[in-house]
Regions:
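Aromatic-rich carbohydrate-recognition surfaces in CAZymes
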Residues: 55, 135-141, 145-236, 260-268, ...
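Inter-helical turn/loop segments and adjacent helix faces that build the functional surface
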Residues: 197-209, 274-289
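Non-catalytic C-terminal accessory modules of carbohydrate-active enzymes
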Residues: 387, 391-561
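Extended glycan-interaction surfaces of carbohydrate-active proteins
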Residues: 56-58, 64, 95-135, 156-181, ...
Length: 781
């Protein structure tokens, strides 16, 4: 195609103002034309990337130059933030790696990432979370560091991570659901980020500083949040808006007892990272222990989360005494399972081809919750899409990698900034909460260039350069002025493919696929990578329209006199509300399927936990309903009950006393009170559950860090941990149940102790306070 017809084709494709007339002055022609190709690079049902322009419906965005993006996108009227329709470089980027490619839009999006990265560096050299979000957040900054800040902003990354260490020398779990840790437990991503900084910088003093913090935090978690199955309990990493990803009936205490795939995967990665730290520092025995723990957790993840019928890991377990799997696909956790080799090689391929991919990109999870607005639910987050793109490249999925790149580049171009999240139905930024200049979004933008197309991978003692270049992006691209452990790297990648044919450093050839020792990279290093330019073996992409799951049934237990009989529980009849579009209901007892019916009731003539799942005509299941138990329970009151509150740890004291307790009152507990003890009798051997009826008005349901934590002791032996999340500011009349601790017991008498131990220290440190009303004991089986 000649240059004239190239321009005409661009106009015909609707590029209009995105394309300027071409000049025809000899040797400059190719350079002038490289940003004006009408070739379609990527097309989905939602948008098209053509040349230097993104098209979506009537809107388009294009690169005027590598330092300017313009967009015609119009936002929703009345939304609290306007659409940025232009980005122009405002910061000096000369000290950062410089990209040159055969696509101007790619260069501009990368440069916008750098420009907004400079905006994110605060005067105290910490990394700001986003334009609308000041300060440092553990998970946000850690995920950003792993993607690209460890090598783009190593000093700010170090300072930011150290801001997230508390006075006890442990990693901070930021304020969150029910009072932070141990409801949310993804703070260990800090460990992975800290080790990534070491790999990028080789700074041994940094390693000596962070290793004790990592080890101390891991040991505390192992004593508190490990489930009987050897999995880590707690909220799904980063997806921390409760009803945005969990059934509405689940309280924060229920979330604290769930086992989330993504959180477990990052924890296994953290254990491996800490083991590597220990090994480098000569702590061989500790390294071996950590490696063994990582291996055991990896085995548990593969045993309990893998869904053969889906070809990927389920999202989380949920319920009360009998957990079931939420079979949704959760993209970040799946991506991490590939990137950190938690999934074996064959499962990595399966995940790559089976995780659903919508026209706008990979969902946070799939399918969506039908009666929830867009934020984590029904959303695309570019930082998650970036991790998924890295994982697709590692798995060798060319089409998946291209669609991943597009899912990040489309919104970056159309909105002329790195926003946090987008509605998965229409690709718009109208969600429950959003921000421009988001740290993890821009970090992911940069990582697509550096980690995928240039294939930069940091090892503990060197650099592995292994690009993955889809055929649609073939050509020559350079990344100059890349700093690595004091050396300046100028990297050129030629061609396309999944494999390197030849790699040279200052003219000296190195074996493709092998780590280049750090000691060989000194001064200025010109690295040239020639790809093999062979077709990448085709792999499937599980392209799916965005899908909404049916609403959750509401259930209740009643007495049906016709079902009464010896051994039959009083509440012997399970009922639920009819849902119009449900084709059948599944009835579960103790987490197992016992019946399918089109009716809205079922005889519950055996004691147990009962739930219902609705299945719509497409075969899509709802969440399981809240477990309803008709097992008999024994209730114990505490000794020395009262009605007053006097602890110095008390926050938000009630104005007119406490109401809603049973018996003569309640007992008040804090870090200094003596253990509460109750003598109980177990009449029959079996599995028993222990729970506390409690109140905690020290903070709101959705934030702060004052969850109360206590240890269950039976005859002097530790048997589990009680978690008592915040239930609302000053809500001392709102009594709820703690988690249930299952213990196998033989018949006999026991002394129950509820005590505060060092591992019960919460994130607030100073306030670990609650009111206790009852101890509830049930025979589970």
């Amino acid at each position: 195609m000649n240059l004239h017809s190239l321009y005409i084709a661009a106009i015909a494709a609707g590029a209009g103002a995105a394309f300027a007339p071409l000049t025809m002055n000899g040797a400059d022609t190719v350079a002038e034309a490289r940003g004006f190709s009408s070739d379609v690079i990527l097309s989905t049902d939602a948008y098209r990337w053509q040349g230097d322009t993104i098209f979506q419906n009537e809107f388009k965005a294009w690169a005027v130059s590598p330092e300017e993006i313009r967009s015609t996108y119009k936002g929703r009227p009345g939304y609290f933030m306007p659409v940025e329709q232009t980005w122009k470089r405002k910061n000096d980027l000369s000290s950062y790696p410089r990209l040159t490619s055969n696509n101007k839009l790619h260069e501009a999006i990368y440069n916008m990432g750098l420009d907004e990265m400079v905006n994110a560096v605060e005067p105290d050299t910490t990394l700001r979370t986003g334009k609308e979000w000041a300060g440092v957040w553990t998970r946000d900054v850690s995920y950003s560091i792993i993607l690209s800040m460890c090598y783009m902003q190593p000093e700010a990354s170090m300072i930011s991570l150290m801001k997230k260490v508390n006075p006890s020398g442990q990693i901070i779990q930021d304020t969150g659901s029910g009072g932070a840790w141990p409801i949310s437990t993804d703070r260990m991503i800090w460990v992975v980020a800290a080790y990534e900084i070491y790999k990028a910088t080789g700074d041994r003093q940094w390693l000596e500083k962070v290793y004790p913090i990592a080890l101390r935090s891991i040991r505390k978690d192992m004593a508190t949040v490990m489930s009987p199955r050897g999995l880590i309990k707690g909220e799904t990493s980063f997806i921390d808006w409760r009803e945005q990803s969990y059934p509405k009936w689940m309280q924060t205490v229920d979330i604290s007892q769930s086992e989330a795939m993504g959180t477990n995967v990052l924890y296994a990665a953290a254990l491996n990272a800490c083991a590597q730290m220990a090994d480098i520092l000569g702590q061989r025995k500790e390294a071996a222990r950590l490696k063994a723990d990582a291996g055991a957790l990896t085995d548990a993840i593969n045993k309990y989360f893998w869904l053969d019928d889906k070809g990927y890991y389920g999202m989380y377990t949920y319920g009360r005494d009998h957990k079931i799997m939420n079979p949704r696909a959760e993209t970040l956790g799946l991506a991490l399972s590939i990137l950190y080799d938690i999934a074996p090689a064959e499962r990595q391929k399966s995940i790559s081809t089976n995780n659903p991919h919508t026209p706008y990109g990979p969902a946070i999870f799939y399918p969506q919750i039908s009666d929830m607005p867009s934020y984590h639910n029904n959303a695309l987050w570019p930082f998650v899409a970036s991790y998924w793109t890295l994982a697709q490249a590692k798995a060798g999925n060319e089409a998946g990698t291209m669609e991943g790149i597009g899912s990040v580049f489309r919104p970056a171009a159309l909105f002329a900034t790195n926003k946090e999240n987008f509605n998965l139905d229409n690709g718009d930024y109208y969600t429950e909460l959003n921000s421009s200049n988001m740290l993890w979004s821009l970090a992911g933008n940069i990582a697509i260039t550096t980690r995928v197309l240039f294939g930069i991978h940091f090892e503990k003692d060197g650099l592995l350069i292994s690009p993955f270049v889809p055929k649609a992006l073939e050509g020559t691209r350079t990344l100059d002025n890349f700093n690595y452990r004091g050396a300046t790297l100028n990297i050129t990648v030629n061609g396309y493919g999944a494999n390197v044919a030849k790699i040279t450093v200052n003219g000296k050839e190195y074996a493709p696929g092998k780590t280049i020792p750090a000691k060989r990279l000194k001064g200025v290093c010109d690295i040239v990578v020639d790809m093999d330019c062979k077709p990448i073996p085709a792999m499937d992409v599980n392209r799916r329209p965005n899908l909404k799951a049916p609403v959750t049934p509401q259930t209740w237990l009643t007495n049906n006199p016709a079902l009464n009989g010896e051994g039959v529980p009083v509440n012997n009849y399970l009922e639920w509300n009819p849902i119009e579009y449900i084709s059948k209901y599944q009835v579960l007892k103790n987490g197992l399927l016992v019946a399918e019916t089109r009716e809205t009731s079922w005889p519950a003539t055996e004691p147990g936990e009962w739930q219902v799942i609705g299945i719509d005509a497409r075969g899509v299941p709802s969440f399981a309903s809240e477990p309803r138990s008709n097992r008999p329970a024994t209730i114990y009151q505490f000794k020395n009950e009262g009605t007053g509150m006097k602890s110095p740890e008390l926050c938000n004291a009630p104005a007119d006393g406490v109401k809603g307790y049973t018996g003569q009152g309640f007992v008040e507990i804090d870090r200094t009170t003596d253990p509460e003890t109750i003598n109980i009798k177990i009449p029959q051997s079996g599995m028993y559950t222990f729970a506390l009826r409690y109140a905690n008005g020290n903070g709101p349901v959705n934030t702060e860090n004052k969850a109360a934590i206590r240890t269950l002791m039976l005859n002097g032996s530790k048997r589990g941990t009680f978690v008592m999340p915040q239930r609302g500011v000053g809500n001392w009349d709102d009594w709820g149940m703690s988690n249930r601790i299952q213990v196998p017991l033989t018949a006999g008498t026991y002394t129950v102790g509820i005590t505060y131990r060092p591992e019960n220290e919460n994130m607030n440190i100073n306030t670990n306070h609650a009111l206790l009303d009852q101890l509830v004991v049930e025979k589970a089986k």
